[in-house]
Amino acid sequence: MTTDEIRSRLFALQDVKYRDFQGGLIPGMNPENMIGVRTPELRKLAKEVGADGTFLAELPHRYFDENQLHAFIVSGIRDKQECLRRAEEFLPYVDNWATCDQMSLKCFKKSPEELLPHIREWIDSERTYAVRFGVGCLMEFFLDEHFSPEYPEMVSKIRSGEYYVNMMTAWYFATALAKQYDAVLPYIEQHRLDQWTQRKTIQKAIESYRVSDEHKQYLRTLK
């Protein structure tokens, strides 16, 4: 399927009201670069297109929805090396939180340690959404049975003036407080995050149904 054919399919699935709603959620996105395709339709189309080399290679894409489709396609690739290669190719063109968070390297779920060298590179990157993606991978794959104290240590060292990096850092620590409370609580008690991220972490943890009322009460004292 050519890029023009894919674009025609996307416009056939257009929902203008949804486009207008979605545009309000992504500051800085030019409405002219948004088509307005709902997520379930993008998922279906991603399965139909598959790992189409032509579409994936034609970067940058013109439309936000094409980037979303690209993220879904990469997420569905089962070969680990191919998936990683395509993600690395795509990351420099990711320019918003929605596309960044949409992409998941699910084929590494059983062996996420293979991603660690790449996660470290992403976190050390100067590109906002590479950093966000790296932290997101740590949150997705390394807060359960693959958890190690070195991972929150990595995230705690991030210092950025970028809202979408700091928000992901807060999201990571709030999720970690739900899953690895004892291990990550010292980061909050010792104020090892910058003040904004500390406050946002506590806010998100307090809003979470996965954090106990007892823990929430204590976290309120640490703002």
Give the location of each predicted region.
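Alpha-helical scaffold domains
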Residues: M1-K223
